[in-house]
Design a protein with these regions (language model features):
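Alpha-amylase-like alpha-glycosidases and glucanotransferases acting on alpha-linked glucans and related
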Residues: 1-46, 141
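Carbohydrate-interacting/catalytic domains
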Residues: 40-54, 59-69, 73-238
Length: 238
């Protein structure tokens, strides 16, 4: 299949060099090139691709079960649209480590998400029931505890809640993803007294080399958040 980078860089497979007239490999990659097929210098296309890649890693590392991804996805390795590179012992299938410098932003983001996963045992189901009576997993499609599957919602929120391993406080994480091409507003669940929502991760935030991805912005007394187009926001209750 496609690498994660290629998933957002190619609409079609490009297996011509395999020698089968591009007839091999899966034809249903469900990919999107974000407006340009393959490599491009368009900053808008490249910016969107990076945001979607971050969204994918955020979803993976906020999911239950073992988190696995293809080697090189953490620095946007490419197979140039080839989704069946079994016969390519060359740059098509090799890991191009030079991309680590070009895509340091993605590499740093993946490191941040791995650390975030380690810090929140609820994402790994290493918790007891929460003391605040929130369910362990709940769905919030646009509004609190709205589990509707109506396609018009366009905005999904998933909240994890449990008692941490030391049994000292609740571990509450809210994952929110807007796949729509316009900004949308998410209504957040009201937290128990003394706790407030903090933004931990925003895949639309501007990146500065060496920045602290863990810096949080507190939402004092606010139970709504504007989610930019095609963006993931992760909040924690503190």
């Amino acid at each position: 299949g496609f690498t994660l980078y290629d998933l957002y860089s190619y609409n079609e497979k490009h297996n011509e060099k395999n020698g089968w007239n591009n007839t091999d490999g899966d034809n249903n990659g469900h990919s999107w090139n974000c407006g340009s097929e393959g490599e491009t210098d368009d900053p808008n296309v490249n910016g969107l691709r990076r945001r979607l890649i971050k969204n994918a890693f955020a979803a993976l590392l906020c999911s239950r079960g073992p988190a696995m991804f293809f080697a090189g996805d953490e620095f946007c390795n490419t197979q140039f649209g080839n989704n069946n590179a079994y016969c390519q012992d060359n740059i098509i299938s090799w890991l191009d480590w030079s991309r680590l410098e070009e895509f340091k932003e993605i590499h740093d983001f993946v490191r941040h998400m791995i650390q975030f996963r380690k810090e929140h045992p609820i994402l790994r189901k290493m918790t007891k029931p929460s003391s605040c009576q929130f369910p362990e997993i709940s769905v919030h499609n646009g509004t609190p505890f709205n589990a509707s599957t109506d396609y018009k919602t366009k905005l999904i929120g998933i909240m994890y809640a449990g008692r941490n391993e030391e049994d000292t406080e609740d571990d509450i994480v809210f994952y929110c993803m807007n796949a729509y091409w316009e900004p949308l507003v998410m209504q957040l669940p009201v937290l128990p007294n003394g706790k407030h929502w903090h933004v931990d991760t925003n895949t639309n935030a501007e990146y500065f080399d060496g920045e602290d991805f863990t810096a949080k912005t507190e939402l004092l007394g606010v139970n709504t958040i504007r989610v930019p187009a095609r963006t993931t926001i992760i909040l924690v209750a503190e």
